[in-house]
Amino acid sequence: MTPAAFYKIKEPTRWAIAPDVFSYSSLNAIKRCPLQWQLTHSKYGDDEQLFPFRPSPSSVEGDIIHTVLERLFRALSLQRLPKLGSPDFRECIQHVNAKKTVEDLVKKHEERIAAHPRGNGFRLRLTSQQLTNKIIRIFRQQYSQVVENGLDLSSIQKLACQNIESEETLDPSFLLNKYGLLNEYKLKHPNIPFVGILDFVCLDSEQTVIVDFKTGKQDEDHLRQLLYYAILWWRVSGQVPNRIEVRYLGNVASFFPTKLDLESAEEEMKNEVASAFRALSEKPAQPSLGSHCSLCDVRQFCDTYWGEREKVPLDSIDGTAVVDLEVVVSVHASDYGFDATIPGGENACIVFEPGTGCIYGPFASGEHLRILSALRKHETGEVELKPWSEVFRV
């Protein structure tokens, strides 16, 4: 889909329906805003493509860091978490090759952005070397704590992931007892359409522990996610996990679930799935406004959001600020901007550099536009289209 065609999209060609099975992240996304989930999973244009997410430098860099850290911890976990500097440790580090992995991931993202209809203005803030250095700092700090205060993995056999994948139809508790560890193990609830991929399940002093490593801030929702995964383990294997554990930089959040805890959480899971099915049965689904709206990738399609925006006069915004603005072009645009009218009658002066105007223009008198992430200048009151701004026809 070309940028010219993309920015003229007004609604989906084919509306998304509820998925056959839900994940923890999809349930959370639907609960946050059913319309947002529906719009991001609907099909658009004559070729019925999914709506492309707006790339964000911070999120791309975060994904790269998380991916490499995850590969390092996974590889070292399968080697029973050897000590820093040991032969097994060095062998693992060389195999993962963090520097080359980062370079490959950066190249992959750059290629994707080059062909992305919303890739204008995208630049990573950190170089490949800076990303690698950041990963090494985080990894050294976290790995030392894991080894010193971590799990007893002495009983784990050294194995390749394929050994488990070829036996995934077996009882997971049997596999856990056989190998001592399961990595990225997928489980599906037998009665509720819910699926999860357990990053790390191990035997710690003969106790079953479900573990997840997080590089961000501590969040109670992370333990709740593992509690849902504990339900899957319980229902598939018949065994209640002894412990669930989220490992952060410098901290560990643990919970020791009982059967009663799992039964209560399972009822919540069942209700959430039913609620998600109901919410997605409407086309369009109902929106749920909140702090997430300003970062929503599909807010240009949400009439409720723009209705709320109309209630905030442009002149009431203090200081220089990034704004979303719905306007009607008053006169044909020049190479540097145009005058426009905001719903409600307020006038606005939209300005831009010629290069930016070429991307989203030409702008004709009477056109109805929804502008995302423009810069409202406090000194002049002008609204400037920046390289990261977007302009959609309504």
Q: What does each of the following model-derived ranges do?
A:
Residues 27-77:
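Nuclease catalytic cores
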Residues 32-36, 269-313:
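Cysteine-cluster motifs in flexible loop/terminal segments that predominantly coordinate metals
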Residues 68-179:
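A non-catalytic, helix-rich entry segment at domain boundaries
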Residues 174-268:
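Mg2+/Mn2+-dependent nuclease catalytic core
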Residues 304-324, 393-394:
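OB-fold nucleic-acid-binding modules
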Residues 314-344, 373:
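Structural detector for short beta-strands of small beta-barrel domains
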Residues 325-329, 359-394:
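Flexible glycine-rich surface loops and low-complexity tracts that mediate binding to linear polymers
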Residues 342-366:
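Beta-strand/loop nucleic-acid-binding surfaces
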